[in-house]
Amino acid sequence: MSEKKINLLDLDRKAMRALFADLGEKPFRADQLMKWIYHFGVSDFEEMTNINKVLRQKLAARCEIVAPEISSFQKSTDGTIKFAIHVGEGQEVETVYIPEDDRATLCVSSQVGCALECTFCSTAQQGFNRNLTVSEIVGQIWRVSHFLGFAKDTGDRPITNVVMMGMGEPLLNLANVIPAMDIMLDDFGFSLSKRRVTLSTSGVVPALDKLGDALDVALAVSIHAPNDELRDILVPVNKKYPLQEFLAGIRRYIAKSNANRGRVTVEYVMLDHINDSTEQAHELAKLMEDTPCKVNLIPFNPYPGSPYGRSSNSRIDRFSKVLMEYGLTVIVRKTRGDDIDAACGQLAGDIRDRTKRLAKKRMQENQISVTMN
């Protein structure tokens, strides 16, 4: 059996340089290779013209550059594109491209499914399957960039911002998310500014501290409720890491972060008559009193079977005005891609059904195996 090749998309620059040292090559050769991969979208070693033929042959013998494939895509009337990305074994994740006048953002997944069971989120209904590898995370950016078109002559890339807000909780896959984000930030990787890479978390506090020790990126925090009683229901991880513990972790992170410019983005989904009253707005403002932040109010995006409804515009407006009375910066997020189920909280769709079928098949196979043994 031939030895499995190393997928170079799994390696950040430190790991790439270690590989090249093992090949008897100087570190700058690793940097050259990364530039070909991430600046120009090249996956064929023979196209890497400033790398000598002998090294190209060594690389081809031991390594490969393989990104997950696009299974299908849907384009919204507002230009948003939702991609189903095949990650092997019948599994898919969703990645969303959001074009705007001054930027082009890619919403990237970190897991197949999610284990946190937030009750307003479609992805939670899928359940958790597995963590994505580094190559499957950065490969979403690489593959969508190919779809949109790398400018191979200039190295200009079509994606300016990345948000880790797709399927999964990034902090539960820290071992792969950190090197993946390192590649996003690296000058020889996707070369994105740390203010243009955002990680969103529901509050896995110990992992948030580890992230702060490893990387500096923009942070968005999923609060969604002004007190522990309601948040225990909406975001069950709150039972393990309640609000005050989460907020303390947030303050520790932004204290050592330059990317956040001294404040964090609070995400708050607006659920009709659940968390959107005037009293709850006052409660949220007081909760965030000691945590510098701007608040992003997210109109809920319904999905089939959801127990919640979207807050009316008038309730969102009242809620927003109360927060602003406390001096908070408030943004009401414009819903993008909801006609193709690509909006916040809607990711899963047909993928949920396919994943459940796969899990059922695996369970049946395991039962057969146990019976035979």
UniProtKB/Swiss-Prot annotation:
InterPro entries: Aldolase_TIM, Methyltransferase_A, RlmN_N, RNA_MTrfase_RlmN, rRNA_lsu_MTrfase_RlmN/Cfr, rSAM. SUPFAM superfamilies: Radical SAM enzymes. Its EC number is 2.1.1.192. Disulfide bonds join C107-C344. The active site is at E94, C344. The lineage of its organism: Bacteria, Pseudomonadati, Pseudomonadota, Gammaproteobacteria, Alteromonadales. Signal peptide: none annotated. Keywords: 4Fe-4S, Cytoplasm, Disulfide bond, Iron, Iron-sulfur, Metal-binding, Methyltransferase, rRNA processing, S-adenosyl-L-methionine, Transferase, tRNA processing. This is Dual-specificity RNA methyltransferase RlmN. It is found in: Cytoplasm. It catalyses: adenosine(2503) in 23S rRNA + 2 reduced [2Fe-2S]-[ferredoxin] + 2 S-adenosyl-L-methionine = 2-methyladenosine(2503) in 23S rRNA + 5'-deoxyadenosine + L-methionine + 2 oxidized [2Fe-2S]-[ferredoxin] + S-adenosyl-L-homocysteine; adenosine(37) in tRNA + 2 reduced [2Fe-2S]-[ferredoxin] + 2 S-adenosyl-L-methionine = 2-methyladenosine(37) in tRNA + 5'-deoxyadenosine + L-methionine + 2 oxidized [2Fe-2S]-[ferredoxin] + S-adenosyl-L-homocysteine. Gene3D superfamilies: 1.10.150.530, Aldolase class I. Residues 100-339 form the Radical SAM core domain.
